[in-house]
Amino acid sequence: MKEQIYRYVDAADYILCRYGPLSFPSWEDFLARNSRKLYAGKLRRAIPQAATHLGITPFFGSTRNLHHDVTEPFPIPDCSVEAFQSEDVFEHIDLSKMVSLFNEIHRVLAPGGLFRLSLPDYHSDQNLQRCQRGPRGEIVFDPAGGGKLVDGRVIEGGHVWFPKIEIVRDLFNESLFATHGTIKYVQYTNADGTFKLDPIDYSLGYIQRTPDHDARVADRPRPISIVVDAFKS
């Protein structure tokens, strides 16, 4: 019931922002906030970050969301953000853009600031069992990620790459976090099925798709997401 109410409120907020009398927050509004925390994608009132963060999305405006494409540079100064979180968003963005995006997040984070990243884990049995594969056994489409597979390409907003810990490590190793930061790989599955499942400090940013909150892996706790905490030095 509460979730349904939140959806109605979010929808009303969008209409009132688009047609008046409310307005979308600006980057100047963000910089004037006491708490400068960003959340990639649409920020809904049903999640705890609605009280602490502003979302970044070009698709859905509201009083809690900045109208901006996260792959474009952020029009704010260096070292002006306390924390940046992305949960199940970056797999919808072309893999070739990841390192530059990580570096832009590093630029705007204040020293000691946190980049919390969570992505679907494609070594996880829960995620693998639903995927379509190509002739060499490679994952080509995840129907749960949205979009369509057309002529070998995922279109219309689906997962355009399929995160595994080996890929994510390489991305961070190529980013500024490797040379000017600390990277903690908190939860992930290895190719051989072994995994790391360290406790998550949810006070730093709630994550839904973990054994603590996701019923699919609650009976036999194991990673369903790759969770990384990267701190700027």
Task: Give the positions of each predicted feature.
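Conserved SAM-binding loop
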Residues: 1-127, 228-232
